[in-house]
Amino acid sequence: MTNVQLVTNNLIHKLERYMDDAKSIYILTSFVMKSGVDVLAPLLRKAVEKNVDIKVCTGDYLYITQPDALEKLYDIHPDIEIRLWRSAGKSFHPKAYLFERESDGVMIVGSSNMSRSALTSGVEWSLLVKESVGEEAFSEAIDQFLHIHMNEATQPINIETIKQYRKEYEEF
């Protein structure tokens, strides 16, 4: 495989490949749908059972993220650190999948949210870049992810915050 690749379909195959031997997995998607969690759950469960550091950050922008998706993601394993960006109406639209591995790092940045369609059969474009080609960009992506993930605009996902978000979602 080349060090830079355009991925236009079946992103799930790339995610599976890089999740398999990752030391850390960082997922940043503006929206999370239950269908996407259904696709990723087995891979996330397998990774967390190997003590992989997994962090997920999604947003409440336009209330597209489904409460059931957050609940299903939360139920995978308590060691997966999930946070919700509280947008206050401001656009929140990133999509990135970052993998730190023993040999290298890989970042996939593009149009794919966490939905079955985006991960499997939808028309999506993502750029896969290996750390060896874009070391500075990869390092910056990790730093920016961690900055967003721990930003004061985010809140940890737990039973109470899911309940609160569900109420807001239903009222929107």
Question: What would you call each of these model-derived segments?
Answer:
Residues 1-172:
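PLD/PLD-like phosphodiesterase catalytic module centered on the HKD motif
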